[in-house]
Curated annotation (Swiss-Prot):
UniProt-annotated binding residues for (6S)-5,6,7,8-tetrahydrofolate: S112, I113, L114, P115
Catalytic activity: L-methionyl-tRNA(fMet) + (6R)-10-formyltetrahydrofolate = N-formyl-L-methionyl-tRNA(fMet) + (6S)-5,6,7,8-tetrahydrofolate + H(+)
Signal peptide: none
Name of this chain's protein: Methionyl-tRNA formyltransferase
GO CC annotation: cytosol
Keywords: Protein biosynthesis, Transferase
PROSITE patterns: GART
Pfam families per record: Formyl_trans_C, Formyl_trans_N
Enzyme class: transferase
Species for this entry: Shewanella putrefaciens (strain CN-32 / ATCC BAA-453)
Amino acid sequence: MKSLNIIFAGTPDFAARHLQALLNSQHNVIGVYTQPDRPAGRGKKLTASPVKELAIANNIPVFQPGSLRKEPAQQELAALNADIMVVVAYGLILPKVVLDTPRLGCINVHGSILPRWRGAAPIQRALWAGDKETGVTIMQMDVGLDTGDMLLKTYLPIEDNDTSASLYEKLAEQGPIALLQALEGLTNGTLAAEKQDEALANYAEKLSKEEARLDWNKSAKQLWQEVRAFNPWPVSYFEHQGNTIKVWQAHVSETISTAAPGTIISASKKGIEVATADGVLTLLSMQLPGKNPLNVADILNARGEWFSPNTRLANEAE
């Protein structure tokens, strides 16, 4: 297989894993684009992205423009004379002039089965909606938001115990393999581009902390999906006894209850059962303010009086 001269554009750890796969391949990564260094940690020290750190460790030139809309940045990119640009969770918009610069254009690795879940949070939204599968799409980029022609798709079943954290790990393994397959198909002409069906498209909006508040007026199934979707960020939570209590793990109980939504049905080391508008949600792992996440048995040892049966947990509207 012919080797390609590649510009890689990406920022977080998910992207760095794809860069590592390219570095391990026969292709030549001739330049890396990543977001400018950002303040991080308690000291707000300027911190390089995982992609930048990996590029520096491998002596690859790094470019960190604040925008690619200006001509000097575009000329700098064109001067690299790349065959193709690979984009993974970069975070900057690529104008048409940039998309058209490499000989084979720009391709993107997206963490969903397009056209479902275009946008910023596809992994989380698939869980949030109760999807049965997700996957990776390699697409030829155009000026739209994840609207380009699809070159290759992989599929991954979503298990009942999956969270955003676990799906992230699985897709971070699947994505690099799919990327290398797509590059091989592009070079030997075996990939057939497929148009996206706009009728099937929807958008994965960014998550918000407010959205993670548990509303007991929803069904137990929906709340279970939210707990999994919002792990590890922003983490589902409810207010009780003047405290914000995070919920890291839960499942739908087989218990039947006619109690008002938000009422604690039972509390034991097996879990805290809470009535919802439809069904009962069992809380398995929680986090008290200023503490680490704990299983329910340890929570009850510390604050059992907070979770006595028939106690009502406040709803969002109350």
